[in-house]
């Protein structure tokens, strides 16, 4: 395995761990991580979590974005933020869906 591939694997493992911790710290419910790399051409990993209300969903997404931005990790796209019934955060090879 090339050094770059090892680095990317370590980075993705650290990112998955960080996202799971942030979701747990923000009291997200029903947290599931799904490996879809062999089933999707769009992404490799999907996190799915739920909040108790639209306010909670928005707070979870806000905290996730804020904490990851501190490590210079910014979402490529955000969907559903205005209504906050569900919010999709696109981090390229990793998606986070909070509903």
Spans of features found by a protein language model:
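Catalytic metal-binding acidic patch
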Residues: 44-46
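C-terminal structural segments of small proteins and small subunits
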Residues: 88, 92-99
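Short hydrophobic/aromatic beta-strand micro-patches
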Residues: 48-50
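Polybasic/polar functional segments that serve as interface/processing modules
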Residues: 2-42, 54-87
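Short glycine-rich anion-binding loops that position phosphate/pyrophosphate groups of nucleotides
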Residues: 52-53, 94
């Amino acid at each position: 395995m090339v050094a770059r591939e090892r680095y990317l694997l370590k980075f993705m493992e650290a990112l998955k761990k960080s996202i799971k911790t942030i979701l747990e710290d923000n009291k997200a419910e029903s947290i599931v991580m799904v490996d879809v790399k062999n089933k999707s051409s769009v992404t490799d990993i999907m996190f799915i979590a739920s909040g108790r209300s639209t306010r909670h969903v928005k707070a979870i997404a806000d905290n996730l974005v804020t904490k990851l931005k501190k490590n210079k990790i910014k979402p490529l796209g955000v969907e559903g933020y205005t209504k906050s019934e569900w919010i999709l955060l696109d981090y390229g090879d990793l998606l986070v869906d909070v509903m």
